[in-house]
Amino acid sequence: METKKENTTKTRVYNIIILDKSGSMSSIRKEAIDGCNETIGSIRAAQKRHQDTQEHYISLAAFCGCGIDMIYDKTPIDEAKELTWDEYSPCCMTPLFDAIGVTAKGMETYTKAIAEFVDTTVLVTIITDGYENASREWNASGVKELIEACKREGWMFSFIGAGEEVLKTAEHIAITNTMLWKQTSEGTKDVFDNENKARDRFFDSMAESCCCEAAPMERKKIKMMLAKKYYKGEE
């Protein structure tokens, strides 16, 4: 019996959310959970819109001083269940650089291993309300070097931070797509709404540009162009 070959014409889209789970997130725990679940729904809807050209996966890394909890790890979006109250319980410190470094490095290694067989796109969104204060494995320069290397491969990085000072962290690690986060119920809802709209624009633009059908170098250029204008709407 002939084995059916995998369809390699679709782009595998890896959606990574790196979510702060430090103690200060307790006051907006419900809003953070609701926002993540809305994002999951938004990605699921995007896959339905672009089912002929895109195949979506999600990784959700919730981090605090206790470690990095990979709630989802390259999970097919149709298999991702809603984030629950028990799965997201804020506590302790903010090892931001470790969370970014470990999660992005793992995905970089994985995508390099499958690059010969499939086209991949990676979107990384970092959501934090505080400063780095507990990393043990990664520092700012190491994270910056990793992010710059991944951006050259067409990855998109965005950083959502509470306060102008927190957003300066993004600049130090080579992330230019930033959004200010007002830590209220309404502010948290607005942040996730805007993030999901930006993500939808990115997916729709990928589909319009027929990214999966382009030559490898052309695909990379398209992704880099889309990544640079992630939060810039219709500009």
Regions flagged by a language model, labelled:
Residues 1-235:
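Acidic, low-complexity intrinsically disordered regions
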